[in-house]
Amino acid sequence: MTNCLSFRNGRGLALLCALLGTLCETGSGQIRYSVSEELDKGSFVGNIANDLGLEPRELAERGVRIVSRGRTQLFSLNPQSGSLVTAERIDREELCAQIPLCLVKFNILVEDKLKIFEVEIEIKDINDNAPNFPTEELEIKIGELTVPGTRFPLKTAFDPDVGINSLQNYKLSPNDYFSLAVNSVSEGAKYPELVLERALDREKREIHQLVLVASDGGDPVHSGNLHIQVIVLDANDNPPMFTQPEYRVSVWENVPVGTRLLTVNATDPDEGFNAQVSYILDKMPGKIAEIFHLNSVSGEVSILKSLDYEDAMFYEIKIEAQDGPGLLSRAKILVTVLDVNDNAPEITITSLTSSVPEEGTVGREIALIDVHDRDSGQNGQVEVFVLGNLPFKLEKSVDQYYRLVTATSLDREQISEYNISLRASDGGSPPLSTETHITLHVIDINDNPPTFPHLSYSAYIPENNPRGASIFSVTAQDPDSNNNARITYALTEDTLQGAPLSSFVSINSNTGVLYALRSFDYEQFRDLKLLVTASDSGNPPLSSNVSLNLFVLDQNDNAPEILYPALPTDGSTGVELAPRSAEPGYLVTKVVAVDRDSGQNAWLSYRLLKASEPGLFSVGLHTGEVRTARALLDRDALKQSLVVAVQDHGQPPLSATVTLTVAVADRIPDILADLGSLEPSAKPNDSDLTLYLVVAVAAVSCVFLALVIVLLAHRLRRWHKSRLLQASGGGLASTPGSHFVGVDGVRAFLQTYSHEVSLTADSRKSHLIFPQPNYADTLISQESCEKSEPLLITQDLLEMKGDSNLLQQAPPNTDWRFSQAQRPGTSGSQNGDDTGTWPNNQFDTEMLQAMILASASEAADGSSTLGGGAGTMGLSARYGPQFTLQHVPDYRQNVYIPGSNATLTNAAGKRDGKAPAGGNGNKKKSGKKEKK
């Protein structure tokens, strides 16, 4: 490819078209251009983008740049046009001197591909220099006796241009005595000589003025002038003569300054002044006069300045020998500089990738290095290698370029940074070497998932923990770095008891600390199985799981719960039955309690906290069985009150209490008969207090009785067909009816309004007792164990109701019994015609539910001695081995209304007032008492 460029010089050249840009591919990746010297900065050299197969914009994108080994940049890249341009004005004479072919070599690096292209540019000479003589004037002395035809050497002109632009011819100004002869040598140099054509006559003309013109072959032609002054002397017919026209000498570049190279010698056969020879170093352009010294007297040539083979390997020195009158002769000295290994190799990092990803492919380019040694021959032969056992190697590229590539895969987790040392050694003796160091960072890729130090974890947290409490901390390790090692924690979604697991436990995504979102209850669940996921922040992210078993530790947060006797909901008190004939160790009842805690916190112990008759009963420490501690005596009260405490073994221990009422009698009718005559014993010192209590209770009783009357009237209106109180009529309107219902199917005396009525025929006072609830939840509640004082209702109060017959009590209907078929059973089938007017829907249902609960709770207990006989009414039959609902007698057979002639029957035919056939039960009881 040829480019025609134009330029202007200072003298007004219009246009010079020359062959400038011949581009060719020489070998692999070699580009060649040609350009003229003295072009302006930025002048076009060649379309480098097109020759590289790139678009102009890709020069910057792909990192295309010039590599010139530290020399002055003569050329640059224009990223806009994609062309190679001059970086400054180029002077071929300064760059290449007299070398005919001036070549500038450099390399172009394509950064992203780490590819090198060799570029060679030929600098074309232009005729920018005129021939120039060393001096402007030359004085020649010629004897008048000089024979015509004698030749006198003249100063040669020097033109730094080459080729046709260099010195081409000499021309002497016209004269009558002298002519010009030009001698050409093999190197192409031309030496002018002044030829004497006619004999001189000093007497006619002593001085001759001549002009020697040196011209080049350029267009336009440049020339230089030398003014010659010829002085006619007396006769000196022999010039000095060198022993040899050319001297050759070789010298090592490292010789010291002042070293003598050689001595030249010239002789003159004349005598006297005409034979005195002096040596002159011809004035030559360049730095020869600064490097070499010629002794004008001895002809000794020595070194003034250190030689450097790398700067110049050859010197040509021109010398002259002149006698006294001025005759001279010429010779030249050829100095060859010998190379020594005085330069260590140079390592230049042309391109460098400071970081590479780990686990990359083998052969990944890291750096492009240029290795150069300024020495020559074996001294310039360089070998470069990587020091140490590192996973890198060097591959030869073009010229003296090497590529540093990976030899194996890199693993950042093993080595994250490499300090690569490169050593270049030449082949000299001794060899010289140079080292350079490259720091390479290995970029992490996400090739390692987070790992936990353990396969699974176990954590423990006590129940009733505060919300937000820290439970446990898990930590995973990731050998990667930065985001690839930034770990986040999460819980795998799951459900627990129908609720999402995230509502129970949360985890801090950054620290791995688990927190409780709610207060745990050991009684609800005892352990949680969690799956913790640790994920890094790489792309794509990697994760791993670990199982965490969270165990809830039991705390003593539940007090014992008493199942039997169940705490009543209507304020009544249950009664347990103990026969007076019971022997020591007789099982009266059993307190059954459970604790929702576990372990030692649920280990229960029972003890008798308080008893109305100390020493009469005992409680099993671990069984809760209430047994008689001794035989029952006549002096023992009919009604015994016991407070039993149930305590667990937690820290601190929790407890609950229950109040038991034990009736000492063989049968329920005996209890009913005895309760009517019981008078609460008052302490002597409590008379005043009793009076105050009677007055207070009397006031409350009035309000209470009024309410009872209203309620009873309402019920009588609804149950007007009931024959429960037919015989008594309205006589008991002022007294609330009592219902003997067992709680849990066992307790015999459960009064709806929680009071007891005792009416006697021979007393003017009736006793109305309002007992307090006799159970408590904790040991602190002890007031329930105290016996309430009775409230006396006077006869006057009863007379206000207008019926004095209420004080006359009819004997109880002892024949009020139910046949076996009429008693309630599990099937609930009774003859509707035989059931009297007693309401049975509500109470039978309650009785059935209570007995089912009791049967389920205690059916397995076979140690009881109580049975379901007629004397005990089956109140404690739950401790029997065959307790069923059929063993429970009808509670209505033992109910009567004190102070009333009315009796409850289950048949319409038994209302004639006659004593029933089975009315001897009370007589038998009286007989037993008399015997005692």
Swiss-Prot record:
Residues 922-932 have a biased composition (Basic residues). It is a single-pass type I membrane protein. Residues 1-29 form the signal peptide. Residues 30-133, 134-242, 243-347, 348-452, 453-562, 570-682 form the Cadherin domain. It comes from the Eukaryota. Residues 714-932 are cytoplasmic. Keywords: Calcium, Cell adhesion, Cell membrane, Glycoprotein, Membrane, Repeat, Signal, Transmembrane, Transmembrane helix. It is found in: Cell membrane. Pfam families: Cadherin, Cadherin_2, Cadherin_C_2, Cadherin_tail. GO terms for biological process: cell adhesion; homophilic cell adhesion via plasma membrane adhesion molecules; nervous system development. CDD domains: Cadherin_repeat. PROSITE patterns: CADHERIN_1, CADHERIN_2. GO terms for cellular component: plasma membrane. PANTHER family: CADHERIN-87A, PROTOCADHERIN GAMMA-A3. This is Protocadherin gamma-A3. It comes from Pan troglodytes (Chimpanzee). The gene is PCDHGA3.
